[in-house]
């Protein structure tokens, strides 16, 4: 069996999609018309460093991931048995599964990016070396009750999310714990996947009400539940995803439990491929996890 994985925010880089925009000219022009700016110029020239601003990053990654997927299908004609995406990448997984067409997905991620970009007083950081339970215990022990766990990327890679000043306080706490191998602040504009996204979630819920989703043809593993989407739950899960944790480790463990599974990352970079290796290695090293 094979699972296609689609990366999310953080995988963007100048030059991504360079070989795809001319090959898929019609879709690129549709994206430009929908967004009101040139996707090719954004990705190749990165004017005003817009590629790293959430409201531009999310549409750009969605488009490049879609074109990468279409190129892959065009070249090898192999449909995956499962699809999954990390945060924003989940929209590409749903596109691949037929839940919506290219432009519908683009309209969704444009709105999502706009809403998330408005929450600018937060920060995120990756904690390496501790499990999610250990991170949660440390937050409680040191009175950091205003910080949430945003991503559970692997057994020992956890991302926390909160107000800027609280993440700064957490830095000294985690760097003082002997099992922490790294505390790495992320270059993001807000406290994504946390309680601080509740307003964005509420607005996105309203926006989603005008959309109808088609039948899913490939199982899509949800970040929120680490299980396949149910057809009647797409609206609620997409809204919940904004302020809920990304259960990436659990999602990959679920897929690994299906038997012999190959994973292929579709889109720019190799972040998810690296996480797959970490999940496999750390799970083998810690069977009780």
UniProtKB/Swiss-Prot annotation:
It catalyses: holo-[ACP] + malonyl-CoA = malonyl-[ACP] + CoA. It comes from the Bacteria. It is found in: Cytoplasm. PANTHER family: MALONYL-COA-ACYL CARRIER PROTEIN TRANSACYLASE, MITOCHONDRIAL. SUPFAM superfamilies: FabD/lysophospholipase-like (SSF52151), Probable ACP-binding domain of malonyl-CoA ACP transacylase (SSF55048). Belongs to the FabD family. Its EC number is 2.3.1.39. This is Polyketide biosynthesis malonyl CoA-acyl carrier protein transacylase BaeC. Pathway: Antibiotic biosynthesis; bacillaene biosynthesis. The active site is at residues 87, 193. Coiled coil: none annotated. Keywords: Acyltransferase, Antibiotic biosynthesis, Cytoplasm, Transferase. Involved in some intermediate steps for the synthesis of the antibiotic polyketide bacillaene which is involved in secondary metabolism. It catalyzes the transfer of the malonyl-CoA group to the acyl-carrier-protein AcpK (Mal-AcpK). InterPro entries: Ac_transferase_dom_sf, Acyl_transferase_dom, Acyl_Trfase/lysoPLipase, Mal-CoA-ACP_Trans/PKS_FabD, Malonyl_CoA-ACP_transAc, Malonyl_CoA-ACP_transAc_FabD, Malonyl_transacylase_ACP-bd.
